[in-house]
From Swiss-Prot:
Function per UniProt: With S4 and S5 plays an important role in translational accuracy. Located at the interface of the 30S and 50S subunits.
Gene Ontology biological process terms from the UniProt entry: translation
Species: Pyrococcus horikoshii (strain ATCC 700860 / DSM 12428 / JCM 9974 / NBRC 100139 / OT-3)
Record keywords, A-Z: Ribonucleoprotein, Ribosomal protein, RNA-binding, rRNA-binding
Name of the protein: Small ribosomal subunit protein uS12
Classification via Pfam families: Ribosom_S12_S23
Keyword check for rRNA-binding: yes
A GO term from the CC aspect: small ribosomal subunit
Gene coding for it: rps12
Subunit structure as annotated in this protein's UniProt entry: Part of the 30S ribosomal subunit.
GO molecular function terms attached to this record: rRNA binding; structural constituent of ribosome
Parts of the chain that traverse the membrane: none
Family that this chain belongs to: Belongs to the universal ribosomal protein uS12 family.
Length: 147
């Protein structure tokens, strides 16, 4: 039978499976997962959290229809020197963070590892400042250690 491409014998199962596998490479999600492209391009290198040094404090304008300045910091990661922007959650949280402080950042929890809500282009949030939880500092339960 001319033009027939798939084997169809009694013992052709292995060959059929191998043939199907080739087509998976045209699926972008499969390709990215198998080649581990997310970890390679991710500043945190696949880790859940990372340590960094605060370079500067910045305010980012919220997306429409909201208005207001969302407080964030530019952080240089210790493990690879990459610079990322991290959001400071909580009322007055930015006042507990100074330049050259050591912070721990983690993903902000947006869809597909992206930004969240009305904060444009910020994928990370500050969790700890000088080894003290930012949440505790904001609530007033703990004090920032003096150097």
């Amino acid at each position: 039978m001319p033009g027939k491409k798939a084997p169809n014998g009694e013992f052709a199962g292995r060959k059929l499976k191998l043939k199907r596998k080739k087509f998976r490479w045209s699926d972008i999600r499969y390709k990215r997962r198998v080649l581990r492209l997310k970890e390679k391009s991710d500043p945190l290198e696949g880790a859940p959290q990372a340590r960094g040094i605060v370079l500067e404090k910045i305010a980012v304008e919220a997306k429409q229809p909201n208005s207001g300045m969302r407080k964030a910091v530019r952080v240089q990661l210790i493990k690879n020197g990459k610079v990322v922007t991290a959001f400071c959650p909580g009322d007055g949280a930015i006042n507990f963070i100074d330049e050259h402080d050591e912070v721990i950042i983690e993903g902000i929890g947006g869809p597909k590892g992206g930004s969240m809500g009305d904060i444009p282009g910020i994928r990370y949030k500050v969790v700890k400042v000088n080894r003290v939880s930012l949440k505790e500092l904001v609530k007033g339960r703990k004090e920032k250690p003096r150097r």
